[in-house]
């Protein structure tokens, strides 16, 4: 059992180190093969001549007005539908 845990821990550490090393290689520019600093990319052009801009995703804030609770068969029987949604 100890050997099994040790092997799983080793595999997990290998996966984490590979993930960290590949995330460091990703940059916003084009890297040279000789490990020179990244050259920033120019924005791509759309056919009508306008520059393509990157839009950041917007998060929606949802306010919960009623407390959430678990559905019981009694709640469903009284209301006739599921009140949890």
Curated annotation (Swiss-Prot):
Highly expressed in the venom apparatus, and weakly expressed in residual body. Residues 1-23 form the signal peptide. The keyword Protease does not apply. Disulfide bonds join 71-84. It is found in: Secreted. Keywords: Disulfide bond, Secreted, Signal, Toxin. Endoparasitoid venom toxin that exhibits insecticidal activity against Tenebrio molitor pupae. Impacts genes related to immune response, environmental information processing, metabolism, and response to external stimuli in T.molitor, suggesting its involvement in the intricate parasitoid wasp-host interaction. This is Insecticidal toxin Vn1. It comes from Aphidius gifuensis (Parasitoid wasp). The lineage of its organism: Eukaryota, Metazoa, Ecdysozoa, Arthropoda, Hexapoda.
């Amino acid at each position: 059992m100890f050997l099994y845990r040790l092997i799983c821990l080793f595999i997990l550490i290998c996966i984490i180190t590979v993930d960290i090393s590949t995330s460091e290689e990703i940059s916003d520019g084009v890297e040279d093969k000789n490990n020179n600093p990244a050259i920033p990319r120019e924005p791509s052009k759309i056919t009508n001549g306008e520059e393509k801009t990157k839009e950041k995703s917007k998060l929606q804030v949802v306010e919960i007005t009623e407390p959430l609770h678990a559905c019981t068969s009694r709640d469903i029987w009284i209301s006739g539908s599921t009140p949890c949604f």
